[in-house]
Structures are given as C-alpha cells and as structure tokens.
Design a protein with these regions (language model features):
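Bacterial Sec-dependent N-terminal signal peptides
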Residues: 1-25, 549
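Short loop/turn motifs that connect adjacent beta-strands in outer-membrane beta-barrel proteins
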Residues: 14-26, 62-66, 99-108, 146-149, ...
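Short glycine/proline- and aromatic-enriched beta-strand/turn motifs that initiate or cap beta-hairpins
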Residues: 19-46, 362-364
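Outer membrane beta-barrel
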Residues: 61-158, 185-187, 275-296, 467, ...
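Outer-membrane beta-barrel proteins
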Residues: 76, 80-87, 161-164, 248-261
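Hydrophobic, small-residue-rich alpha-helical packing segments that form membrane-like cores
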Residues: 132-219, 223-228, 233
C-alpha cells in the first residue's frame, strides 16, 4: 500500500514541475521504523505485548505559487520502546494551510513550528527520535514587506502528543531589523548588524490546585506568564558576536518545585572563520527557565522554549555513551570553546594531503544557590533561593576532545579522536555519582575502487565508575550506488561482559531507502539539542524505510 501511495504521488508531482507558473506541486515523505522485538533477559529487555512495534509517519504537501496546504499522518499505536505513555496513538495531528502574497506577507492557519532568536523563550519543533512535537495549533502572520525588517505574530494552543491543552494558550511576537540595510557604509565595509526582540504570553484559562504539604494553604498560581527576549548579532568580516538576554515572569511549576522565582538567561557567543582556521567561544547562564504550557507535567513534552545545548554533539558510539541533558529548571553556567586548524599540504604537519585538527572544550556547572527560609519545611510558595550571578556550583559536565582528520593516500583516510569526560550522573540521571572517563577513537576509510568502500571504527572507553570499560568495533562495506553492509559490536568489558552486536543491510534506490538489521541495543539516553530520552535495552529485527518525493 505504501508503495502504491509513493508511485501515485510521484506521478502527480511530475504533472506540476513549474511552481512559478502557479502549477500545483505535490510532495511529501514516508518514514517507518519497525522493531520485531525479542525477549533477552541478559540485557534486561523486559517483555512485550506486541509482536511488531512501529513509529510510522506520512506527510503530504500540495503547493502552488501563493498557496500551500499540508498534513501528516502518524501511526504510533504500538510505538518503539522508550517513548512516554501518552505518545501512543494514531491519526492526523498536524495540518496547516499557508498563503504567501509574494510581496512579503505570509499567513498560516493550523499547526505552526517556529523559533524566536535562539529559542530561549519560544521554540516549537518536531524531533522524531525524541518523540517531540510541540507545535502551536492556531495561526501565524509573517511580514517582511519593509527592507531589512521581519515581523511575526502567532498564537494558539500547544500540542502534547494526542492532546491540545485548551486550559492554556500561547501568543507571541518577534521583530528583527537588519541595521546594515539602512547604512551603505556598513555594507561597503562588510558589516552586518541585526537586532531583535520577542515577547511571549502564556495564559492559563484554568489553574491547577496546588496545596503546600502539611497546611491548608493553596498556592495562588499566576494566570499569565510573560517572557521577553532581546538580542544583537554583529558580523564584521570574518568575525561574529552574538548577545542575547531572556527573562520570564513568575511561573511556579512541578519542574522548579512550585517556587515563585523569576527565570532568566544570558547567552554570549563570539566566532571567527576563514580559510583553514575557525574559532568559537560561548558562554551561557540560565536560571529557572523551564517553560511549559502545562506547569504540572513532567518528562520532555509541553515545552514552549528550548535552551541551547553547550555540549559537543558526538556521533561516535562511545563518546555519546554519556550525553549531557540541559538543566533548564535548576539552571547552569555553560562554557564552550572550539578551535579548528587545517595544516596546509606539503608542510611538516600537513604532509602530502594536509591535516585537519579540531579542539573542543565544554564545561558546565550548576549555580551557587542559598535557599531562602522554608515554609512548613518546604520551599513551595517562596522564591526558593538566592544566588550570586557570577558564582558557580558543582560540576555537571566536562568534555575535552581533540580530533584529527588525515588523508594518508589517495584511497585511505584516517580520523582519530581522544576525549576526556566528566559526567555528573547524579545531576543528569538522578543517581550514580561522577563518572570520569577517557575515550579513544580510530576510524579508517579505504576506497577499494570506484564502486566499493570499506570503513571501520575502533573505540575504547576507560572508567573506574558506573559499568566500567567499554569497547566498540564496526566494519562497513559500501557497494555504490545501492547497498551498504554493516557489522558492529559494543562490548562492556567491565561489569557485565555483555555484547551488543548488530548487523544490517541498507539499500538505496533513487528516493527510497530501506534498512534491515538484527541485534541488540543497550539501554541508554538518546539526546538531541540538550534534550534526552531514555531508551531501554532491546533485541530483535529492525526495519527502517524512508521515501521522499
């Protein structure tokens, strides 16, 4: 049936290739991830009620020169392991209609994704690997009719899985101005300066009843929560400086222990980039910035904002074993620096083909807090704590890694990485203390001929904490243009001595991609952008199909 849909949709798309002449164009995608699970008590999979688990999505968009309508069907009735209970369901939860005048005015009705600035006070988005879809159902207006000026206004109710919480609604506006558009001198000197400001209102039509334990005192929860954001981005030649400040009014919630302290965030970023050299330095201080459309829920759903992650996003398996989750409610001081340099060809360190080096440092600490006087033994209903702006608390996370990319011959390329990591498992996961580890990675890629490429990875993690040492190996053979064969094993050489083996075959043909695999997956956290989802251990047949047209 899916193949039939794909064929007919592709045919319709070919009928309208020239959108500029107001033809109708149909495009979309299908994504289906399937697990046929097996019980494996050695790795703690637990038992399953269903023989087949799947997360399946199908999107369709019909567009012309000025109009666009779209929707997404989701079948999550028997979801993959590790998603929250309310994630289960099926239907068409995402629909929209959009009008674009072609003269700087765009109007959208339905479900909206958007972001103000860096997302400190507003970001709605979809991230399927985490099970996040926090779209606003309502409307949005974008206006860019004036030179260098972009304005947007939106409002509606927020999606939380298969529920749209009508007990609250969200509205917001955002304005950005490119100052350089009004200065010929700035443009002549390659200077770009953008300033922006945002406002978000969260209104509760109905408030929860929260009583301080041991008393009859019910908290007077605010019906309106206001948030503001101002920012400035200046680019001069190869240099860029970004500064952003966000503030949120009182919002007692489950996340912050129902305290009345206001939230704030400051973000500073400076970068430089030229041929062969790049540098980035960032700092962020956030405090009590968990911001949801429902103040009593937990987990990863219902967020109106998203605090940017200041930890390096690793793609290798063992460096990603202990990923950092942004601590939005407690707050954090986060620092990140990155320096990259390309040694030129035919130099002592560059060799025949050149060498790429990169150093990344992430250092994240808590805030130094002094609790206020409790009421009946609890901080509920109080400001919670006092803090000094520049003082830091305990270490949450640290990652120092060095990476090298080196082409040794026309057919062989070598990547090396060393990483030193400190991971406060008690803060990030709830228990476990500080995990200190050292990780080494070697990746080789050998092009056998124009059709076949062999890639391999060897990784090792040393630690005296948690489950001890880990080893990882991978071999991958690509047979262009259609097939890829992969074998891997993650082995806990420390505490459990368990192997997490996996074998897969991936086939690609035009816009189709099909992966068939079998093996084990270890329990752990899947993270993206500082948001993490716990994924339990699993074993079985994995099937993944993707098609885009």
């Amino acid at each position: 049936m899916l193949a039939g849909i794909a064929f007919s949709s592709s045919a319709l798309a070919q009928d309208g290739e020239k959108k500029d002449k107001d033809y109708l164009v149909l495009h979309g995608s299908i994504q289906s991830d399937i697990l046929m699970p097996e019980v494996d008590n050695k790795i703690g999979t637990g038992t399953y009620k269903d023989d087949i688990l799947t997360n399946t999505y199908a999107e369709l968009t019909l567009a012309s020169k000025h109009f666009e309508v779209g929707g997404r069907f989701e079948f999550l009735e028997h979801p993959l392991p590790g998603f929250e209970n309310d994630f289960k369901g099926w239907g068409v939860p995402h629909i929209y209609a959009k009008y674009n005048s072609g003269k700087g005015v765009e109007v959208t009705l339905g479900d909206v994704y958007d972001q103000f600035g860096s997302g400190l006070i507003f970001r709605t988005y979809e991230e399927r690997s985490l099970g996040i879809d926090n779209a606003i159902r309502g409307g949005r207006v974008n206006i860019s009719a004036l030179k260098g000026v972009r304005f947007k206004a939106l409002g509606g109710v927020q999606r939380r899985y298969w529920d749209w919480d009508t007990d609250s609604w969200v509205a917001g506006t955002d304005l950005e101005i490119d100052i350089n558009q009004y200065s010929q001198k700035m443009r002549d000197n390659n200077v770009s300066w953008t300033i922006g400001g945002s406002y978000v209102l969260l209104n509760y039509e109905k408030n929860d009843q929260v009583v301080i334990p041991g008393t009859n005192y019910e908290l007077n929860l605010p019906s309106n929560v206001n948030a503001f954001d101002v920012r400035s981005s200046l680019t001069v030649g190869n240099y860029n400086i970004l500064a952003e400040y966000a503030w949120r009014s009182q919002d007692p919630s489950f996340d912050n222990g129902y305290i009345y302290r206001r939230g704030s965030a400051v973000l500073l970023s400076a970068s430089y980039s030229s041929k062969g050299v790049s540098a980035l330095v960032q700092a962020k201080r956030s405090e009590n910035m968990s911001f949801r459309s429902n103040r009593s829920i937990t987990g990863i759903s219902g967020f109106i904002n998203n605090m940017p992650a200041f930890a390096y996003q690793h793609t290798y398996s063992l460096p990603a074993l202990y990923p950092y989750a942004t601590q939005a409610a407690p707050g954090e001081w986060a620092f990140q620096g990155e320096f990259g340099y390309n040694f030129k060809r035919h130099t002592a360190l560059g060799g025949k083909y050149g060498t790429k080096m990169k150093l990344n440092i992430s250092h994240i600490r808590g805030l130094d807090k002094s609790p206020v006087e409790p009421v009946n033994g609890t901080l509920m209903g109080t400001d919670g704590y006092e803090t000094c702006f520049f003082k830091t608390g305990e270490l949450y996370y640290q990652d120092i890694n060095v990476q090298m990319e080196k082409k040794l011959s026309k057919s062989f390329k070598l990547n090396l990485m060393y990483m030193n990591q400190k991971y406060n498992k008690t803060v990030i996961e709830g228990e476990g203390g500080m995990v200190k580890s050292n990780i080494a990675v070697a990746e080789g890629k050998y092009q056998i001929n124009k059709k076949f490429t062999l890639r391999s990875e060897l990784q090792y993690l040393w630690t005296n904490e948690d489950q001890g040492d880990w080893a990882f190996g991978l071999v991958e053979l690509s047979a262009l243009p259609y097939l890829m064969f992969t074998l891997s094993d993650m082995w806990n050489t420390g505490e459990t001595n368990q192997h997490y083996y996996m074998g897969s075959v991936t086939a690609t043909y035009k816009a189709h991609r099909l992966m068939l695999g079998y093996g084990r997956t270890r329990a752990g956290y899947n993270c993206s952008g500082g948001v993490c989802r716990y994924v339990p251990a699993s074993k079985g047949v994995n099937i993944s199909y993707n098609y885009t047209f």
